[in-house]
């Protein structure tokens, strides 16, 4: 069974992106094994602590390596993705063997889907920049993406209700992650 690893770019408990991820998990159902990466204990990338690798880094690299597909759900902060998500991707891009830049990293060639929920621009900028970064670190970014403009009323209730059209777009991305 295919293993899909969800990475939620927002740490907020009632994150709209977490809500989208939960909907995606429901869409996938039992057709794949879905798990969510907990990277809340990941230290900031610092070459002084890179080797030996911190326990959180080792755990995360193992989890990423064992997944078939990564699906990132990202908000947009000041026209980009969150700093803690960038930190995670920086760690994943680093060589496991010190200074051995010829050895593939755990994200090289990994298929990655990107979705995002945010303001009126539907995370267009953060998804574009994330696509650029992931391509640079040699991940295989799926062309199908979904950007969701969170309606004004949801900002007051912390509840995101997807439209039928958004649900269909989410299903289309889910199908690409499964196949």
Describe each model-derived feature in a short phrase:
Residues 5, 140-179:
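Glycine-rich phosphate/pyrophosphate-binding loop and the adjoining helix
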Residues 2-31:
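N-terminal beta1-alpha1 ligand-phosphate binding loop
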Residues 56-137:
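Helix-loop-strand module that forms the ligand-binding subsite of alpha/beta enzymes
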Residues 37-55, 154-159:
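N-terminal beta-loop-helix "entrance" segment that forms/cooperates
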Residues 29-35, 139:
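A generic structural motif
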